[in-house]
Amino acid sequence: MRPRLTAVFALTLALASSGGAAAAAAPTAPSVKPPPTLTDSHPCAGQPGFTCSFLTVPLDHRGHGKGELKLQVATADNASAPKGTLVFLTGGPGQPGVPFATRIATQRLPELAKNYRFVVIDQRGTGEFGALNCPKLQAEVGSSDIEPPSKDAIAECANILGDKRNYFTSEQTTGDLDMFRQALGVHKWTLDGVSYGTFTAARYAAAHPGNTDKLVLDSVLPHTDPQNDDMLYLTGLRATARVLRDACKTAPACGFDPAQDLAWIARHRTDSVLVWDMLVSYEFLDPTYRNPNPAGLPAGSGDPVGAIHAARGGDPTRLDQMLKLLDSGGDPVTGYSSGLHIATICGDGQFPWGTSESPVAKRWPAVDRVLRKLPAKATWPFTTKTAVGNGFMTECLSWPRSQHSAEPPERLPAVPTLLVNGDRDLSTPLEWAKEELGYTPRGQLVVVKGASHSIQNRELGHQGRDAVIKFLNG
């Protein structure tokens, strides 16, 4: 179901007869809401060239829930940029947008900032002024999609959010974004999303095709899931074999099969979910997966390919050390809200049991039925236990019933769309980008060799960013 549009006209026409002539009463004046505006504008602290403001939005764009939210936004000062407005959407879900304004516009994509007015938003439930704070969940999993939280952490978060958990889906964020567009006074804008921001950008385009000029989808999560398996992360599990084998073939070649090593680990240890979480976290430090000395870790503590191989050979020391060093949890809530993450994922996702509106008691039996039919190759080199034990599944199995995000059309509108993905990405694997390309009538895919997640923000080279610049400036 689409978000409901608020009615703006209520016209009563009274007819009276007198002397054979019909006389109409004067119509009631239509009640029209004023357009959204940005308030409390001021220079963004530490971000020259950007003005920070607040956008007031309804708690519930469907009109059932009462209340309002104030979302922080940042807008570049070049309001008359020749190519219009570009809204940059961060991921998670759980990341704010405002802290990234200067880095993206002036350090990573200055060629675009000359021609576009960059704008960002702290999406509902995120950032300095609106982050949903669930302390136990924040401490246990932080920004991880994969590490499973405890039942106590999930229950605490559900109690903290209460009925408001219904109002933090991407459907609601899409409504916020269109109010932001209106407040800026632009008819069309370009949307550039990274990671979960690709999901949000695509969902916006599906709901507002006439207001979408171009789309950039960087590190892609498909906007639709007809197979109902994205939350099992089956594509990511299988992609691990391809990524590690590719890393091992890079000179100097390993001389062994890292996928077979990982398959052995997944079947002989009880922490395969945490091993998988470590690999996904590690890609942000070292997309080669083989550097023993990556920045951000103590010397000699990198190289998960070698650590997994050594563990299979009987020495788990390095692997155990990596699991400790890259253990998730503890991210500051203003930088990443685990509470927003759980509310959005559970409200947006399609699961083996259906959606967040399915009764909690019926969810595990549905998962069990799916797992009984799932072939080993669907999760290899991991196991079905790894799939069902991931954070998405663990969080949402016991999450209270809540409003499910309106489902979009399977095919996106025919707007120019660039998809860009690293072939070493495990968080949003290349296979997902190829799937989304099939839903995109005017899409083109650029694969960045040797790169992992978040091309525009983290790519070491320039191939991906050059493709984005050419696409948008062309």
Question: What do these predicted regions represent?
Answer:
Residues 1-27, 55, 177:
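Secretory targeting and sorting signals
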Residues 3, 9-13, 57, 67-69, ...:
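Intrinsic-disorder/low-complexity peptide segments enriched for small residues
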Residues 3-9, 18-19, 150, 300, ...:
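Generic alpha-helix initiation/capping and coil-helix boundary signal
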Residues 14, 88-94, 312-320:
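Compositionally biased, low-hydrophobicity segments enriched in charged and small polar residues
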Residues 29-278, 282, 349, 353-474:
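Gly/Pro-rich cap/lid or specificity-loop segments adjacent to the active site
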Residues 245-351:
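Alpha/beta-hydrolase-fold enzymes
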